[in-house]
């Protein structure tokens, strides 16, 4: 390897080693000449690891120059590589031309992309440091290099070769540095992201897309939409996805709409493809659809005789005494074909009598036409249709019975039928469109029938629901009646219990009142007895004073009596006061007891009201749920 790449001077030992290990230009040319594009090496790719270039700090003499992305990095590719159905059958193929060196002629990209492969070059024993770079625009131009290398010795030639190899590695590194998948790298002269004001044709001529649309212009719409045709993505040019094949234009379109890298250029490609296909009057055929192979059948309308009629031939029987033909009557003809619901029958008569030509007229409706067509099909299945009659087939069964022939009537048949009729005796008819007279009404009948079936099913469903609701209502009504009876019994029992409790409470009240009255009476008797005792004692003291003999005794005795009376009055006053206090305390106790009683009674009423509310909540929702559930059955 030449040290000129690193900017240093080679030593003598390195020159000797280089002279012995580095091949000359002629050897390289011979090696390149032996390379064949159809060799077995083209079946796959060789993977090479990049060799570090900064060794020992000797990289100061070489500076890298940035390279702008250019669509020419793909080389001179054949246009058919974008739209040829046989291109790239293997996933390992690559459209980039292999890099190599020639002695006189410049290398160009092969026209057949299947033969693209990287040639194995002899590089002096050193492994390649980068993947295969894109082919140069004008090749390696070895002629000028070899011409300038002739005056030099072998070591100088080898050094030049190594310099070229170093330049090649630098170009590869710069090319790899270019492969940044962000949209920032695309803001160059090759791709303008501001395409809002550019016309469609101008956007198509963008160097990124020009080759693809040039290839599309050379193909027909059928060829473009071939599902097996393979495509490259031009927006992935120079990137890892450049070698990927997309089978069918739908796959390429999906890739362009969903790719997460180089978003702007991929979306631009999708828009241009859609616009191009729209201008061609087509669109992308989704996978699984066959394009342009079969054509559908169109409904062709026809004119039919209205009302529907069936011609019955060979209906005359024999000649009468006037030598005129007689034949089948109207009612007889209707009875013969009673299973086909004909409305009426007519026969054609001429100068010779019955012409053997009869008509079955059906209802002027789609059903009538279907019945007439069914009769005509019956004759066709038995080989007695119009063609058989016109071929003059057998007219009689074995044994002499006549064979009847029948077919749908057309205008010529009716005109023939009316040939000998005049005025009102002519059969009236009109020619109507089959689509308007039969197809549309039959279609409407089919739709009405489907709707009728739907309504019948809906009515049956509603009837089932109504029946279920009726049964549920009957059950709920019966349960409601039972509940009312049970509630009536409960209310009656509750009322009886209330009356019983009331009687018991009144009895208890009367009992306690009697007890209180007894206590009050006893108390009053004791008070009366106490007062009587006090009065008797006072009278006794007064009587004792009246029996004294002397005045002095009388006076002393009177003082004692007065003192006793005064003391007794004082005691009685204290008694009355204490009695009043005691009665007041008693009244307060009774009032407190009554207040406590009323409070407890109010609390009991509230508790009863709460329990009653809970009981009502317990049973009311259950009944409503049962009604709702029965209503939704």
Swiss-Prot record:
For whether the record's keyword set contains Isomerase, the answer is no
Q: What coarse category fits the chief subcellular location reported for this protein?
A: cytoplasm
Detail the disulphide connectivity of this chain as listed in its UniProt entry: none
Q: What are the start and end residues of every segment in region (Disordered)?
A: 1-133, 147-193
> A single GO BP annotation from the record?
regulatory ncRNA-mediated gene silencing
Family classification: Belongs to the SGS3 family.
Return the protein name: Protein SUPPRESSOR OF GENE SILENCING 3
The gene name reads SGS3
